[in-house]
């Protein structure tokens, strides 16, 4: 992925001085793959909040304590302080949804306590843009030096590669030319929608087409329709022109978020 350094509310913290690196992305922009790559390359553990019980005070230290021998726990905690090891905390947005605001802030208090005075970067934290901004403000209020990175949207060409990797239908291999034709038609049709809106510029089109949930929605459409010739003709029909295609994609994104975020994470906490 392509990263950009974002300005935080405090004076810009240099990459070398930061004790926590926060990585934000608008949606499913490869954060999971990035997390796994960092963990493998750096040989550091991952604390995935989407798979953990709702966090609160002592969740972080409790996790380490419960998964290590007492001696290993003490050594790893010391390594975090001395800059000899790090830990990845993933899925901040899921963690936020599963707990109370006080519980989430208590969890961040633990992170801040372990980070203040530490050498190196004890924590790398990832999540969606809105929650990462909240975490940044809270940690900075606790005098933690934060470096804020953002995963930039895919380019048009990398968007095509992303779609190709997520389309697994046999038709893609058997009818490669037809597949690429309809794939490119969809991308261009979305561009046509933005082009026809005078108040929306080319940059916003690139942000939309580079947004991973949009690409996942396109991939789902191509996975669900193996007859690419028929799909192309349907897309070209008068009732499926640019604006309807964009609406269809947005509806798919909303459905995916409902199934993955609201149904799985939020509703269980509301019905307890």
Language-model features, listed with the residues they occupy:
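Walker A/P-loop-proximal flanking segment of P-loop NTPase domains
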Residues: 1-20, 37
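Post-nucleotide-binding-loop coupling segment downstream of the phosphate-binding loop, primarily
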Residues: 21-86
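Short acidic, S/G/P-rich loop/turn micro-motifs used as interaction or catalytic elements
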Residues: 29-30, 52-56, 92-99, 130-132
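Extended hydrophobic
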Residues: 38, 132, 140-142, 153-160, ...
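Short, flexible/disordered intra-domain loops and linkers
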Residues: 60, 64, 96-105, 136, ...
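Conserved catalytic network of the ASCE P-loop NTPase/AAA+ motor domain
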Residues: 77-81, 113-120, 141-143
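Conserved P-loop NTPase "ATPase switch" module shared by AAA+ and STAND
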Residues: 79-104
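Sensor-1/coupling segment of RecA-like P-loop NTPase cores
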Residues: 114-137
């Amino acid at each position: 992925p392509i990263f950009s350094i974002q300005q935080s509310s405090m004076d810009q913290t240099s990459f070398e001085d930061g004790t926590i690196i926060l990585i934000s992305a608008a949606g499913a922009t490869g954060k999971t793959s990035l997390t796994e790559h960092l963990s493998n390359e750096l040989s550091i553990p991952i604390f995935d909040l989407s798979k953990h019980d709702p966090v609160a005070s002592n969740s972080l230290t409790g996790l380490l304590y419960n998964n290590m021998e007492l001696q290993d726990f003490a050594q790893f905690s010391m390594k975090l302080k001395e800059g000899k090891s790090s830990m990845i905390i993933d899925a901040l947005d899921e963690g936020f949804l599963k707990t109370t605001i006080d519980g989430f802030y208590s969890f961040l208090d633990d992170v801040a306590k372990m980070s203040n005075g530490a050498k190196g970067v004890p924590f790398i934290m990832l999540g969606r843009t809105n929650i990462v901004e909240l975490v940044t403000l809270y940690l900075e209020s606790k005098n933690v030096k934060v470096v804020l990175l953002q995963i930039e949207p895919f380019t048009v060409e990398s968007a095509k590669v992303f779609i190709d990797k997520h389309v697994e239908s046999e038709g893609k291999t058997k009818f490669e030319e037809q597949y690429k034709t309809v794939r490119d038609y969809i991308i261009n049709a979305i561009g046509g929608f933005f082009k026809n809106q005078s108040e929306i510029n080319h940059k916003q089109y690139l942000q939309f087409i580079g947004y991973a949930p949009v690409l996942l929605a396109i991939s789902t459409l191509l996975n669900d329709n193996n007859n690419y010739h028929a799909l192309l003709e349907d897309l070209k029909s008068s009732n499926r022109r640019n604006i309807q295609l964009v609406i269809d994609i947005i509806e798919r994104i909303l459905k995916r978020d409902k199934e993955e975020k609201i149904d799985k994470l939020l509703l269980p906490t509301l019905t307890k």
